[in-house]
Regions:
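A short, polar/proline- and glycine-enriched secondary-structure boundary/capping micro-motif
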Residues: 183-186, 212-222
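Structural signature for solvent-exposed beta-strand/loop edge elements and short helix-capping sites
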Residues: 152-207
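Transmembrane alpha-helices
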Residues: 1-154, 165, 213-215, 230-358
Length: 358
């Protein structure tokens, strides 16, 4: 059963977090508007779409992404304030262990962790679809892909020289298929190819087609042809942040599909999947560090605690970025790259916790 002090700390915890979250997101929106306003005006983006389709989803995405960091700073802020106001001293003199003092913090952290996990895996990906579609329409440069090559199930190799989102056409499409014995069974080359959006239907222009299963092979040339393939253009031509718009099940499916193709996007997709779980669980680690750092009254006041907190946040983000680069460029396991900062900071948290006990 929660005591008055527990309810007081939980109220302080959640209240400070949502206040800081709102303040930081407000500043983020202001800076983002100043950066993108000219593009919105030049591309004639409607005000309604800017607000509802972009900035509402913008706040959901970035607020949830950095929630563990904001929780950390919130814990340091209100705990240091309690320490400076000598609200914590009676708790220490009452003989309560540090673990009991941490109980309301962990209740608040658990609530925010569960909320973040639900948002990360199920809600934010759907709102990201709206946000990324808006960016594609009103802000980003036209998507282009050069020298695409991938292997699809059924020993099917697909290559094209160029794709432009402006006319949504593939240039110089080549498709080759082999049998299980690595014998060529099919060849297709088209000067242009266009995928009907949202379907597996394609329109080929100026194409050559050869099926080796016919006697001596039959070469067909035509001006135009409608056909179907097992893939779509949005699987071939996609930005690096495409994984942000995939739910948990969609992301798992996409990873398996990209692995078969030997795609360079596999590490990006795996990092996105692991990060959605690792970041929320960092809340517990950062909460322990925050309480341990800020629960003692210091001569430097709250400012010193905030400085320590900002330094640790910087180190955490730097470690995440370095290991992410190692996973995408050097081949480090994405699971290790995402979870290692949490493990390192768990060790740091245990050190701070032991010092707080003393």
């Amino acid at each position: 059963m929660l005591k008055r002090i527990d309810r007081y700390i939980i109220k302080k915890f959640l209240g400070t977090f949502f206040f800081m979250l709102g303040l930081i997101m407000l500043l983020s929106v202001v800076f983002d508007i100043s950066e993108k306003l000219s593009e919105f005006i030049s591309n004639k983006a409607p005000l309604k779409e800017i607000f509802f389709e972009y900035y509402v989803t913008f706040v959901l995405y970035y607020g949830n992404t950095f929630s563990s960091m904001i929780i950390f700073l919130s814990v340091i802020w209100f705990t240091a304030k309690m320490a400076q106001d000598t609200e914590i001293i009676p708790i220490w003199f009452s003989g309560r262990p540090v673990s009991r003092f941490l109980r309301p913090y962990f209740i608040g952290a658990t609530f925010l962790t569960i909320l973040s996990l639900i948002l990360n895996h199920f809600i934010v990906p759907r709102t990201n679809k709206v946000r990324l579609a808006f960016e594609e329409k009103y802000y980003r440069d036209i998507l282009t892909v050069d020298d695409y090559q991938a292997e699809y199930p059924g020993n099917e190799l697909v290559y094209f020289s160029n794709y432009s989102g402006q006319d949504q056409r593939i240039h110089d499409l080549t498709i080759q298929k082999w049998s299980k014995d690595q014998e060529p069974i099919y060849f297709l080359r088209a000067r242009f190819a266009q995928n009907i959006p949202g379907t597996n239907k394609w329109r080929l222009t100026d194409y050559y087609e050869k099926d080796y299963r016919f006697p001596k092979g039959l070469l067909i040339h035509g001006r135009s042809k409608d056909t179907t393939f097992s893939y779509r253009i949005d699987e071939m031509a996609q930005r690096e942040n495409a994984a942000q718009a995939l739910t948990f099940s969609e992301l798992k499916t996409a990873i398996e599909r990209e692995k078969i193709k030997g795609s360079k996007l596999v590490p990006e997709f795996e990092i996105e999947l692991h990060t959605r779980t690792a970041f929320p669980f960092a809340t517990y680690i950062l909460t322990i560090i925050g309480v341990s750092v800020a629960s003692q009254k210091k001569r430097g006041g709250i400012g010193l605690d905030i400085a320590i907190g900002l330094f640790l946040v910087f180190v955490y983000i730097f470690a995440m970025k370095m290991l992410t680069v190692a996973a995408t460029k050097v081949g480090l396991s994405t699971l290790i790259a995402v979870w290692l900062p949490n493990l390192l900071f768990a060790v740091i948290a245990s050190i701070f916790y032991r010092r707080a006990q003393k």
